[in-house]
Design a protein with these regions (language model features):
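Single conserved hydrophobic/aromatic residue that forms the stacking wall/gate
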Residues: 1-11, 16
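Hydrophobic faces of well-ordered beta-strands that scaffold small-molecule active sites
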Residues: 21-23, 41-43, 64, 92-96, ...
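Active-site beta-loop-alpha junctions enriched in small/polar residues
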Residues: 26-28, 46, 69-71, 97-101, ...
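Catalytic cores of alpha/beta
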Residues: 29-35, 76-80, 136-149
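Glycine-rich phosphate-binding active-site loops on the catalytic face of alpha/beta enzymes
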Residues: 45-49, 150-172
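Conserved anion-binding
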Residues: 46-113
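Charged helix-capping and loop-helix junction motifs
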Residues: 107-113, 138-145, 172-176
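C-terminal helical cap(s) of enzyme catalytic domains, especially alpha/beta-barrels
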Residues: 162-195
Length: 196
């Protein structure tokens, strides 16, 4: 298929650059193909409660980045992760990426509370996705800083040198220069905070 050709090409290109590949799995039927090329599987917000996909991804033993569903409580989110863990896959990271609220100024509302609450309830690493959490590039860095200060173990950031022509998510992508500044400031914040 065209997807397989694209993924094999992009996978080869990233391997040449010695970069790991994280890609989203949308359906159980695509799992074997994606596992051939990806270093980590992403299960997006819309599939957070796709239990068949969670079980099969758990069996794959590939690391999984599980994104929180837009209307998923934190307890429900942790129970979704249990489907992966129950299959013996201990390489699971949870990703806060914003929830649906009544607010319309941003695409989603980044739930900063989720980070310390999840850190208290689970041993799994917590990744923050401020790009999807806001939907606008100008809010990505401030929310990233807040997430690091709240205890996030990592960030998922979209970067594009020409976001205006990006095939998707251009409006929430940082240009490389802004990304580099954000990384440096995030390191300063992370190094200045001592977590228990």
């Amino acid at each position: 298929s065209g997807f397989a050709l694209w993924l094999s090409f992009r996978g080869s290109e990233m391997c040449i650059r010695d970069r790991p590949i994280v890609t989203e799995v949308l359906d159980v039927k695509d799992l074997d193909l994606i596992c051939k090329y990806a270093d980590m599987l992403q299960i997006g917000a819309r599939n957070c409660k796709n239990y068949a996909l969670l079980k099969e991804a758990g069996k794959s033993k590939k690391p999984v980045l599980l994104k929180r569903g837009m209307s998923t409580s934190l307890n429900e989110f942790l129970l979704c992760a249990e489907y992966l863990l129950a299959e013996g896959n201990m390489a699971v990271a949870l990703c806060e990426r914003g929830i649906r609220t009544f607010e319309t100024a941003t695409r989603n509302t980044f739930d900063i509370n989720a980070i310390p609450v999840l850190k208290e309830k689970t041993h799994l690493p917590i990744i923050a996705d401020p790009a999807h959490g806001t939907g606008y590039w100008q809010y990505v860095s401030p929310i990233a800083y807040a997430a690091i200060a709240a205890g996030a173990d990592g960030l998922a950031i979209e970067v594009h040198d020409k976001p205006e022509i990006a095939l998707s998510d251009g409006g929430q992508s940082l240009k490389p220069k802004k990304f580099n500044i954000m990384v440096e400031k995030s390191r300063i914040i992370a190094n200045s905070i001592a977590f228990e």
